[in-house]
């Protein structure tokens, strides 16, 4: 069933911290990773090959074509811009969501350790703090090592020069040298809002130079079929535009 999402733990950081105080020698990030590991060991992940095929198919379709098939309602705000130089022209993956306190990246660190190959980490920056970067070079490099398919942050980053050399798409609202808090609270794999769009864990994220599209998993098969048809039509219109016969509608 291509519309069956993978089952993953939802991690409320504040609740975990209250229930399981970390040891004196253990910092909070290490503690959260340990707790997440306990959850992961008891959770059976399910992701069918048909679902992965959907992601591969969406990676061949420009976000503009997808947006046109969805009533232009699932595109993130243009404040979220591409900062890296990834290989290819369109990128897609499965959303791993993070709800983060404004300017705090504690739960983003935990999500990086929790993420699997092909995931796209999507972060809401609650409160809109814009003078604290949520990620930098070390985290970008680790995300590339983990073979993630993208990072989408509704907040700023730093180490922009390094970001340009990272081979995966990195989207953010801007840059600042200011560092993040690392205190929490936050949650992983819960519904969030990023770039003005609702994102649920397991949704399909499609990215290109134009921006970021979110496709609800339950709609993915129908959206894919419609977008593929529209792409064929648009390609024919481009050819016609080259000889002056296109219907521009």
Report each predicted region and the residues it spans.
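Short hydrophobic targeting helices and cationic amphipathic motifs
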Residues: 2, 7, 28-32
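Feature captures the catalytic cores and cofactor-binding loops of soluble hydro-lyases/lyases
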Residues: 35-201, 215-249
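Channel- or pocket-lining gating/hinge segments that regulate access to a cavity or pore
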Residues: 210-213
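Acidic, Ala/Val/Gly-enriched low-complexity intrinsically disordered segments
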Residues: 3, 13-17, 23-26
């Amino acid at each position: 069933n291509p519309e069956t999402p993978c089952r993953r733990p939802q991690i409320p950081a504040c609740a975990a911290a209250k229930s399981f105080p970390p040891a004196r020698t253990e910092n909070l990030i290490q503690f959260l990773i340990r707790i997440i590991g306990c959850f992961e060991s008891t959770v059976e992940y399910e992701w069918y090959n048909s679902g992965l095929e959907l992601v591969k198919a969406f990676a061949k379709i420009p976000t503009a074509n997808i947006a046109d098939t969805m009533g232009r309602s699932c595109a993130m705000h243009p404040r979220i811009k591409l900062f890296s130089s990834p290989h290819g022209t369109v990128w897609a993956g499965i959303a791993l969501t993070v709800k983060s306190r404004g300017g705090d990246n504690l739960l983003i660190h935990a999500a990086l350790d929790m993420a699997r190959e092909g995931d796209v980490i999507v972060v809401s920056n609650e409160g809109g703090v814009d003078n604290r970067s949520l990620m930098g070079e070390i985290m970008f490099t680790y995300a590339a090592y983990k073979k993630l398919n993208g990072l989408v942050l509704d907040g700023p980053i730093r180490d922009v020069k390094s970001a340009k050399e990272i081979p995966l798409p990195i989207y953010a609202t801007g840059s600042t040298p200011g560092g993040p808090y690392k205190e929490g609270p936050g949650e992983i794999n819960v519904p969030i809002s990023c770039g003005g769009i609702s994102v649920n864990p397991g949704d399909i994220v499609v990215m290109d130079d134009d921006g970021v599209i979110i496709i609800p998993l339950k709609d993915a098969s129908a959206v894919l079929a419609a977008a593929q048809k529209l792409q064929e039509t648009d390609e024919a219109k481009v050819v016609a535009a080259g000889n002056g016969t296109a219907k521009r509608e």
